[in-house]
Amino acid sequence: MSFQSHVRNLDDLRGPDGRLEALLNTGTDDAPFTALVTHPHPLFGGTMHNKVVYHAMKAFSHFGLPVLRFNFRGTSRSEGTHDGGRGEIDDVRAALDYLTRTYAKPILFAGFSFGSYTGLRATCGDPRVAGLVALGLPVQAAGRNYTYEFLSTCTQPKVFISGGNDEFCPPEVLQQVAASSPGIWDTFIIPGADHFFQGTLTGPGSQLDGMRGLIQTWLIHKFHLKPLNLQEPLAHS
């Protein structure tokens, strides 16, 4: 089956602080899930156009799923003001509400760094969300400690993917965080990669394709998704 995803600018995604700039990669009519991907810390350049976010979107689009990305409040053209991760949780919930209204299908979530923390806070325990992908989950970054006691009630299937040289969450710490979560969870450590999935055991190089492949493999194994013969989206990144 050949499928060509289109990319749409959304004008009607609104959070508590106003309009949220967003892109929707369209999916097939019979897609069994929709997907949401959230970006890293906006005060350090994170937006929905981040390379890790883009590759996570491609992982979901590989199966013909509609994929929503948006900029947190105060980021780029999104209205409002950055709220240190508190109001951003409500932004994620607004995006979940949008997907539910538009598609009425189970949702798969992926977030990178700050986006994984805020996204997990919003999605853990939400019955609309069927599975969780945490990329580069931060534990200590930019002078802030991120804590994950809330994972003790997070029963959805989840996967944690990080680089072996992630400066914001060493692999042994990530394993401890994952083990605090009940239910089904997996961890994948990419040897040689840093927080942004750059670097190999032998030198420089990107590991984004490998990261994307791990997401796809996990989705096939956990949710029995079938890859489509995809053509590239018509616009945007």
Place the predicted regions along the sequence by residue.
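N-terminal cap/lid segment of alpha/beta-hydrolase-fold proteins
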Residues: 1-30
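Acidic catalytic loop of the alpha/beta-hydrolase fold
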Residues: 141, 164-169, 195-196
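Serine-hydrolase catalytic machinery in alpha/beta-hydrolase-like enzymes
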Residues: 19-103, 196
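Catalytic active-site module of serine/aspartate enzymes centered on a nucleophile-bearing elbow/loop
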Residues: 202-237
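Catalytic histidine-centered segment of alpha/beta-hydrolase-like enzymes
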Residues: 80, 193-208
